[in-house]
Amino acid sequence: MPESSFDVVSKADRQEVDNALNQTAKKIAQRFDFKDTGAQIRWSGDLGVEIRANSADRTLAVLDVFKEMLIKRGVSLKFLDVGEPKPSGKEFRLAVTIKQGIPTETARRLITLIKDEGPRGVHAQIQGDQLRVSSKKKDDLQAVIALLKAKDLDIALQFTNYR
């Protein structure tokens, strides 16, 4: 009997994040409490978001609006790595990084979790920034998916390539 497998990945949907960013920019342009604060949000590189405003609490308020839009778009907040508001001239900047991939240390913890608490005969291996889980029984793979969904991890997981 051939082995079945699936991949465990941690990738934010870039298009949904972009939509949330555009909605946030539109909302802060319309809201009265952001008037004359110089508040703006934009992409900074491929996976970075930069928030600017004339005070630290206005940058955090824009961040709250951005988080609200991400939740509405179905993107987990576990993808965000938020820095501290830093003064830069007459304004404050806040750097937000979108985390992609499963770090090696977290992947090792997931493997030990699967070996300790998962069904017997399930094998997990690290492949770059993702995890491949394989077994001869599809029911065991579904049990592993349920196990990983039940655990409160510090990263958001998706299950892809189910064969």
Swiss-Prot record:
Q: Which GO terms describe its molecular function?
A: nucleotide binding
Q: Which residues form the signal peptide?
A: none
Q: What are the protein's UniProt keywords?
A: Nucleotide-binding
Record function comment: Nucleotide-binding protein.
NCBIfam families under this entry? PRK05412.1
Keyword Nucleotide-binding recorded = yes
Q: InterPro entries given for it? A: DUF520 (IPR007551), UPF0234-like_C (IPR035571), UPF0234_N (IPR035570), YajQ-like_sf (IPR036183)
Q: Which family does it belong to?
A: Belongs to the YajQ family.
HAMAP family linked to this entry: YajQ
**Could you name the Gene Ontology cellular component terms for this entry?**
cytosol
Q: Which domain of life is it from?
A: Bacteria
Q: What is this protein called?
A: Nucleotide-binding protein Acel_0286
Question: GTP-binding: is it a keyword of this entry?
Answer: no
